[in-house]
Design a protein with these regions (language model features):
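N-terminal beta1-alpha1-beta2 submodule of the flavodoxin-like/Rossmannoid cofactor-binding fold
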Residues: 22-130, 192-226
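Gly/Ser/Thr-rich helix-start
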Residues: 42, 100, 104, 110, ...
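Glycine-rich phosphate-binding loop at the start of an alpha helix
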Residues: 154, 186, 203
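Alpha-helix boundary/capping detector
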Residues: 120-123, 127, 144, 162, ...
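Short, glycine-/small-residue-rich phosphate/pyrophosphate-handling segment
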Residues: 132-182
Length: 226
């Protein structure tokens, strides 16, 4: 028996719920949304590397967005507009995307509150099934090697599963995953920052972040063209 999300995905494929596509001189592009939260820059640098991987896939284009910080006094965003960097993500960004990659530093083994707050506001997309049948991946950064990378990546996967998305990880056929002595997991890309406040990804961490972007984008292109 077809589930609710199967029905919604079928409607999207049939044209009953048309997706808006990005038009370029080369034609229509498959859009992959990369959403992250970062305080000191490590997760932001991972996000940029994920975007590089996405943009290397023919027919795919990356769209980089961040989330607003959350104040201690209330659960609302601290500022309506970021002072620098990518714009804040909107629900419309999420609805239009053909794929999604989420990133957050760890907070005691979980995703950071600003990203969790944004995901908690996506109920309307869950009701409509707007994300069902789309590929997604996750990435994180920690200060120490055993600082909670895997559990943080898993915490970001849970809302994506509720939305009916296809999770994409990193296989051990990626050479960097076997050779890394820092970040990098089968669950997603990661970075170990150490005590430095300056983001400095290793070659393996950079390669795996790009590989994650390529894998999500390649699957999204296939699904869109199916």
């Amino acid at each position: 028996m077809a589930t609710y999300f199967d029905t919604q995905a079928a409607r999207a494929r049939s044209g009953a719920m048309p997706r808006l596509r990005i038009a370029t001189w080369e034609g229509f592009m498959t859009e992959i949304l990369v959403v992250y939260y970062s305080r000191k820059g490590s997760t932001a640098e991972l996000a940029r590397q994920v975007c590089r991987g996405i943009d290397s896939v023919p027919g795919a284009v990356a769209k980089l967005r961040t989330v607003a910080p959350v104040t201690a006094e209330s659960e609302g965003p601290a500022k309506p507009v970021p002072s620098s960097g990518p714009p804040y993500v909107t629900l419309e960004d999420l609805r239009r995307a053909d794929g999604l990659v989420l990133g957050s530093p760890t907070r005691f083994g979980n995703m950071a509150a600003p990203l969790k707050y944004f995901l908690d506001c996506t109920s309307s997309l869950w009701v409509s099934g707007a994300l069902a049948g789309k590929p997604a991946g996750v990435f994180t950064s920690t200060q120490t090697l055993h600082g909670g990378q895997e559990s943080t990546l898993l915490s970001m996967m849970l809302p994506l599963l509720h939305h009916g998305m296809y999770l994409v990880g990193l296989p051990y056929t990626e050479r960097a995953l076997n050779e890394t002595r820092g970040g990098g997991t089968p669950y997603g890309a990661s970075h170990v920052s150490g005590p430095s406040d300056e983001p400095s990804l290793s070659d393996h961490e950079r390669a795996l972040a790009q590989a994650l972007g390529r894998r999500v984008a390649a699957l999204a292109v296939r699904l869109v063209e199916a």
